[in-house]
């Protein structure tokens, strides 16, 4: 049964104009009872022991460590398909890094790329990992130095080790889902009477305050892991800070773990135009970083407490679609990302944007992309979804730039100016997402 957005969904379906290529869909049967659901969680320390170039502002090297960085990995197995979700305390990485890791992982284990979603928390106080990718095309001044190949190789190695460990630790489990709400973020597209939008605070602008929650329990009902999906830049700390930190996402995850006694994966959402309410401060005290334990951490805990009806009858399906959307004219590109662009039959340069999909039973729909998505787009996709729980996982499997709304491109400012996309991209992506969920059935 389609909810209130039925008319809009039907309008999207017959007008699907975007060139979409179905690459792979690993479907499970939703008509028969699933085998025993299993899950596991692993937490792997990736804190460097030497100074590193930090990613997120201008070039700067770390002078120490404030809090530890981790790969947090959840594995799930419904008896037919295994799925691995990773949350890493870094800012960004190029899709070519994801491709390299997946190639090595598949060679060692047989695990396919479709089975692994590697997200980052988007802290701006963590080391660079891998080549700059698309960032060098419009922020070349930040990358006059070489990336640390030794640290990059270690982070990749630790990720593969963590996924293999999670696969080996799978145990009987149950899954529950729910919502929370927190006022920890704010729209950062500030407007004045004249001139383009600028990075600041816009309390009247759109902001997604919902927390998407997935609770994994052991067979006895004890918490195994919590997945919390909330949209917010990891920018409480500004460029003056030189201490390695997970910023607000890392502080919140650590706090929730201490309170609940199990790992928590912070999965960032459509944070392209959302800042933390305290943003770009020179140090931990002035940025009130510890306050996010209350602003967001306690709200995650409260939402977890309300989740009921966890079930061991879990079935899921995985899918991927490629959206081909025009590439902005005169926009540079990274040499390690040639597989993500092409020239179409009309001679137009297009970006090949990979979207991932995960459906859990008949009530949970999750989509993911390597984007800094504006929150309105994820909120609209959620509104139009026929599923009661629809989540967007951002910064997933690499980074292919900012994706503003069509309405925000004319206002200019930082995000539209560095985006590789055109105003058409919002329609291209929304049509694909809505059509995918409509076609998957209930």
Describe the predicted segments one by one.
Residues 14-27:
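Bacterial N-terminal signal peptides
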Residues 1-3, 27, 205, 387:
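Exposed boundary/loop context
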Residues 26, 31-36:
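Boundary at the C-terminal end of the N-terminal hydrophobic targeting segment
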Residues 300:
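Glycan-recognition surfaces in beta-rich domains, encompassing non-catalytic CBMs
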Residues 1-12:
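N-terminal secretory signal peptides that target proteins for export/translocation
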Residues 34-119, 123-263, 269-271, 277-280, ...:
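Conserved beta-alpha junction segments in alpha/beta enzyme cores
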Residues 296:
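Anionic-ligand-binding alpha/beta catalytic cores of soluble enzymes and soluble regulatory domains
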């Amino acid at each position: 049964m389609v909810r209130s957005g039925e008319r809009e969904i039907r309008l999207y379906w017959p007008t699907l104009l975007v060139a979409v290529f179905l690459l792979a869909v690993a479907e499970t049967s939703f008509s028969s009872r699933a085998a025993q659901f299993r899950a596991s969680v692993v937490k792997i320390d990736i804190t460097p022991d030497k100074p590193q170039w930090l990613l997120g502002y201008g070039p700067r090297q770390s002078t120490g460590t404030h809090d530890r960085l981790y790969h947090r990995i959840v594995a799930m197995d419904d008896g037919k398909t295994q799925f691995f979700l990773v949350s890493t305390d870094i800012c960004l990485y190029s899709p070519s890094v994801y491709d390299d890791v997946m190639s090595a992982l598949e060679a060692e284990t047989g695990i396919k790329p479709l089975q692994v979603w590697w997200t980052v928390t988007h802290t701006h106080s963590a080391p660079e990992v891998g080549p700059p990718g698309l960032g060098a095309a419009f922020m070349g001044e930040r990358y006059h130095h070489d990336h640390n190949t030794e640290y990059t190789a270690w982070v990749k190695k630790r990720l593969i080790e963590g996924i293999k460990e999670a696969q080996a630790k799978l145990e009987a489990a149950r899954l529950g889902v729910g919502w929370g709400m927190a006022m920890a973020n704010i729209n950062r597209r500030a407007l004045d009477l004249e001139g383009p939008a600028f990075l600041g605070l816009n309390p009247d602008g759109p902001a997604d305050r919902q927390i998407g929650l997935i609770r994994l329990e052991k067979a006895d009902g004890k918490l195994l892991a919590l997945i919390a999906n909330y949209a917010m830049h990891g920018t409480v700390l500004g460029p003056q800070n030189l201490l390695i930190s997970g910023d607000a996402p890392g502080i919140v995850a650590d706090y929730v773990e201490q309170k609940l006694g199990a790992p928590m994966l912070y999965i960032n959402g459509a944070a392209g135009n959302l800042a933390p309410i305290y943003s770009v401060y020179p140090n931990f005290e002035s940025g009130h970083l510890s306050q996010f334990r209350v602003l967001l951490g306690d709200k995650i805990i409260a939402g977890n407490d309300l989740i009921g009806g966890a079930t061991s009858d879990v079935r899921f399906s995985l899918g991927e679609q490629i959206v081909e959307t025009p590439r902005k004219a005169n926009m540079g590109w990274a040499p390690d990302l040639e597989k993500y662009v092409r020239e179409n039959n009309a001679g137009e340069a297009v970006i090949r944007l990979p979207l991932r999909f995960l459906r859990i039973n008949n009530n949970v729909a999750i989509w993911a992309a390597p984007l800094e998505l504006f929150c309105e787009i994820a909120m609209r996709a959620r509104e139009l979804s026929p599923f009661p729980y629809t989540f967007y996982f951002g910064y997933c499997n690499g980074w292919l730039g900012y994706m503003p709304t069509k309405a925000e491109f004319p206002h200019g400012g930082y995000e539209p100016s560095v985006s590789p996309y055109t105003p058409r991209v919002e329609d291209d992506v929304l049509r694909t997402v809505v059509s995918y969920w409509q076609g998957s059935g209930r």
